[in-house]
Amino acid sequence: MVPFVLASASPARRQLLQQIGIDPIIQPSHFDESVIQAATPTELVRLLARCKAETVAQSYSAPALILGCDSVLVLGGEIYGKPASPEMAIARWQQMRGQTADLLTGHALIDLAQGRTCVEVESTQVVFAQVSDAEIAAYVASGEPLACAGCFALDGQGGAFVEKIVGTPSNVIGLSLPLLRRLLLSLGYTLADVQNKK
């Protein structure tokens, strides 16, 4: 089995990997995202995912696969990362309700053994419910939206406020499992190569 490192502290990403039999080594990158400037949201998540994976890869010398990810929600051309405050989360939800947005997740997979990197971006459309101000206030008070790109967690309380997903649901949670499989294949691996054997 090839060691698989997740360059993220995200519990949701870790759970997604565990669902498909991968128990990753968790090593958050602590990369300063503010240093990255990009012309488009797609370029931004691509660069951030790569920088996170490369930062963690520097601390490994043995063969391993390093996965870095970054997600943003795009609504009306505006990028919604994690909100800086409850007030910002409320304002964003007031803009998001009843709207359709795109959730973009950049994925960078580094194979240290081959010295190769694959970087791809997955986009999933999210249709939000027409939620009331009271529902928004209660949801933000739960604290959940403050830890999530786009101010919601599909796999948490926020799932009740999503009417429809067009695309890959796991991408909205933070990691496209079908895309991860394709990235592994492009580097010459299968899921079985990184799954923990019982």
From Swiss-Prot:
Any one GO cellular component localisation term in the record: cytoplasm
Record has DNA damage as a keyword: no
InterPro entries from the UniProt entry: ITPase-like_fam, Maf-like
Annotated active site: D70 (proton acceptor)
Keywords on record: Cytoplasm, Hydrolase, Nucleotide metabolism
Keyword hit for Cytoplasm: yes
Signal peptide stretch: none
Transmembrane segments: none
Enzyme Commission number(s): 3.6.1.9
Top enzyme class: hydrolase
Reaction catalysis annotation: a ribonucleoside 5'-triphosphate + H2O = a ribonucleoside 5'-phosphate + diphosphate + H(+); a 2'-deoxyribonucleoside 5'-triphosphate + H2O = a 2'-deoxyribonucleoside 5'-phosphate + diphosphate + H(+)
Cofactor: a divalent metal cation
GO biological process: nucleotide metabolic process
Compartment annotation: Cytoplasm
MF (Gene Ontology): nucleoside triphosphate diphosphatase activity
UniProt function note: Nucleoside triphosphate pyrophosphatase. May have a dual role in cell division arrest and in preventing the incorporation of modified nucleotides into cellular nucleic acids.
Protein family per UniProt: Belongs to the Maf family.
Name recorded for this polypeptide: Nucleoside triphosphate pyrophosphatase
Organism (species): Thermosynechococcus vestitus (strain NIES-2133 / IAM M-273 / BP-1)
